[in-house]
Amino acid sequence: MARTTPIERYRNIGISAHIDAGKTTTSERILFYTGVSHKIGEVHDGAATMDWMEQEQERGITITSAATTAFWSGMSQQYPQHRINVIDTPGHVDFTIEVERSMRVLDGAVMVYCAVGGVQPQSETVWRQANKYKVPRIAFVNKMDRTGANFLRVVEQIKTRLGGNSVPLQLPIGAEENFTGVVDLIKMKAINWNEADQGMTFTYEDVPANMLAECEEWRNNLVEAAAEASEELMEKFFAGEELTEEEIKTALRQRVLSGEVIPVCCGSAFKNKGVQAMLDAVIDYLPAPTDIPAIEGINEDGTPGERHASDDEPFSSLAFKIATDPFVGNLTFFRVYSGVINSGDTVYNSVKQKRERFGRIVQMHANKRDEIKEVRAGDIAAAIGLKDVGTGDTLCAQEAPIILERMEFPEPVISVAVEPKTKADQEKMGLALGRLAQEDPSFRVHTDEESGETIISGMGELHLDIIVDRMKREFKVEANIGKPQVSYRETIRTRVNDVEGKHAKQSGGRGQYGHVVIDLYPLDPEGPGYEFVNEIKGGVIPGEYIPAVDKGIQEQLKSGPLAGYPVVDLGVRLHFGSYHDVDSSELAFKLAASLAFKAAFAKANPVLLEPIMKVEVETPPDYVGDVIGDLSRRRAMVNGQEANEFVVKINAEVPLSEMFGYATDLRSQTQGRASYSMEPLKYAEAPTSVAAAVIEARKK
């Protein structure tokens, strides 16, 4: 079957933003204008197409990033038809994993900002993730119709807070309730959308006289940014010659693709203004799969490999999300980087080294799906019923195996014990948690060996609430959850040398004998977390027992001597020991190593580390004193505040253990007018009194 849309006309984009910037509404409008959905879904009615899990519609926030395909030929039908694959990503920090994962498979992103709130804390996290994966982006300043809307302030914040070179493509005509349309700075025309048909049609008009001077100035700024793409254009610009519309767009595109410029559009998705022009900007400035460098990977023999975005290369794709669908079971979302695959074909999972058969392939439109027969380079689709595929696995042609880069997933910071309400649900709960952990790598499940309880861990209270909620809805398992537990860590502060561990049982028959001498030393928290250095000379311990020593120590790291928390940031140097020809074994050396480690750890000034969160509170000025007072009681280190007339932003670092229930307390202190966000920042040494209490509690 021939390709219906040439790959140069594909745009794989993510829409990402802070929680209330109106991102899902923007996605809904995209589906409406591109003709996919015939009735606009409103988030505040709980009818949005992209938010299809029940909890999302109740809470009005986006949890799983739905992938949708849409087609667009421009506001004035000025382009051949382009295919836009939109991935709607969550804006809540507890779901950062979803954002990280979708950034990995996107080619470009639209960053949505609220014209009132501007660049908010989560925007910074998302921006850093986009930088990490070198994703070219444009910005859309939404909610221009809201009281306090200020377009140019947001343009400035993108520069100062995010370090992005923001260049407006448009200026708003009016603001707040007087917002009527935008001026297209390249064409120097005002665009007015028709309210009667929900903005489906529009007219170009002259720029309002009172805005001419300002528009000229910003147009000059835009043309200069474009001209910097090449010497030739710079000369033309400085000679005072006009650049054509075509030259401006081509040059800007070049600078967006290299990450040098962020074009900024504005509008009000809710009022049906501006989204159409933003879609044009997606086509004008964001990359096709062929505009970005070939994806890199590792060939079967360990050498570096790559795949170009072409149908002629061997098939390669990355599974970036596993979702459970009530009707068809497992859905594996994947992005095709190269080649072609048909439903019914067998592919190779190079990470798990297993074959998988692509039974049915579907293209998702939010939660509606169309079955398709084949997918090609650049496509995003979902496969039904793959047996053993995890997030981040590579699915590729059997005859040309490659492992595309794995994604890195954050370590959970909070844990709670969960138990089913009835004994009968025990097995169902295990099954449900296993399924949910497969979907979400930032969520972990394990059984506490001492208490036998099931412990679930995740990225925050909201994350775990939603997991428990999904168990109830999707798997019909009612569960009780315990008090949240913080994931502490243990480490050492000083170096100790020449600590020995000896395991010897030699009373008749085959004995056991292992003897090691180690040094233990602290490592930089930014480093690898653990290192093992073998400096045995002259065969005092035979080579085959060295891995057993390393293993013996690594097993101790899982549950530290202080309070049973994971041990981090230390190194071990094995430099002496002895063995017995008959009685030595791997097990004996493993036990000797663990004895040496425990003895050394106790002498090396062990400390407890607690997770510190980066907290940002936004509050009306009247409550600043109360908020800071309360943060101080929570052992916060307040790093500063920024204020404008409506809101004060307070930045602080606070131990996670002090943040439980903060949402409720903050609400009551500020009559519900303040909001906050937090994300894991680092681990730091817990004060002696706190550490003592934690260690004591673990002994009970």
UniProtKB/Swiss-Prot annotation:
Residues 8-290 form the tr-type G domain. It is found in: Cytoplasm. SUPFAM superfamilies: EF-G C-terminal domain-like, P-loop containing nucleoside triphosphate hydrolases, Ribosomal protein S5 domain 2-like, Translation proteins. GO terms for cellular component: cytoplasm. GTP binds at residues 17-24, 88-92, 142-145. One of its GO terms (biological process) is ribosome disassembly. One of its GO terms (molecular function) is GTP binding. The keyword GTP-binding applies. InterPro entries: EFG_II, EFG_III, EFG_III/V, EFG_IV, EFG_V, EFG_V-like, EFTu-like_2, G_TR_CS. Its main location: cytoplasm. PROSITE patterns: G_TR_1, G_TR_2. NCBIfam families: EF-G, PRK12740.1-5, small_GTP. Catalyzes the GTP-dependent ribosomal translocation step during translation elongation. During this step, the ribosome changes from the pre-translocational (PRE) to the post-translocational (POST) state as the newly formed A-site-bound peptidyl-tRNA and P-site-bound deacylated tRNA move to the P and E sites, respectively. Catalyzes the coordinated movement of the two tRNA molecules, the mRNA and conformational changes in the ribosome. Belongs to the TRAFAC class translation factor GTPase superfamily. Classic translation factor GTPase family. EF-G/EF-2 subfamily. This is Elongation factor G. The gene is fusA.
